[in-house]
Amino acid sequence: VRRMSVFSLSNLKKTWYYLQKNGIRNAVWAVLERIGQEQEVYTWQEPDEKTLSFQREHSASLRISIVVPAYRTKKEHLEAMLNSVSRQSYPHWELIVADAGGTAESVQAWAKKNGICLRKAADASNLAEWKDQSIMLCTLSENKGISANTNAGIELAAGDAVGLLDHDDLLTANALWEMADCLEKEKKRGKQKLVLFSDEDKC
């Protein structure tokens, strides 16, 4: 099935346009690279319960704000993202969903189904209001694009660090713990990391 998808009519057209623009040598390399990628088998690596239990008992104190810009997100994708965040082994997080339209009702329905009280955006003005594992729904007045929508969510963040997550992405259960652990280790070494980017097993 993977090989069939490589040689679809759509891909052949793209290859032809690429060849015209970049020449036959570059086109051949691009095709070979694509075939290699299609044949790769990726295994989703979930941590076992023993690992998660250890992480719950040995967590850093760093507070992480996760900002999710959302716009007309499909319900099933949104719920999967929310579930993946709520199941984190790391306890010190808040989730801020910056909704630019078409997502608020799905967030509210998910929260009601799971017995979660959504936080109000006004609560973020006071850091003392921080509450572990809280979820804030910020309804934006208009859709200004992913960058501006993300910035609107960041402005409400009360954490020590900010993590960016797409509205249809998933986190493995240990993702935030791994990030916080890395930051904590670097801090003890006298270093401060400004940006961290995780591999596919942590995001």
Short names for language-model regions:
Residues Y17-S84:
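N-proximal low-complexity "stem/linker" segments adjacent to membrane-targeting elements
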Residues L82-H92:
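Short, acidic, metal-binding catalytic loop of nucleotide-sugar glycosyltransferases
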Residues V85, D99-G102, K144, H167:
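Conserved short acidic donor-positioning loop in nucleotide-sugar-dependent glycosyltransferases
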Residues P91, D99-A111, G115-I116, E142:
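A conserved acidic beta->alpha catalytic loop
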Residues L140-A157:
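Glycine-rich, basic loop-to-helix element that forms the pyrophosphate-binding segment
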Residues V162:
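Short aromatic/hydrophobic "clamp" motif used to bind/position activated sugar donors
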Residues D166-L170, D199:
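The conserved acidic donor/metal-binding loop of glycosyltransferases
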Residues N174-C203:
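Conserved donor NDP-sugar-binding/catalytic core segment of glycosyltransferases
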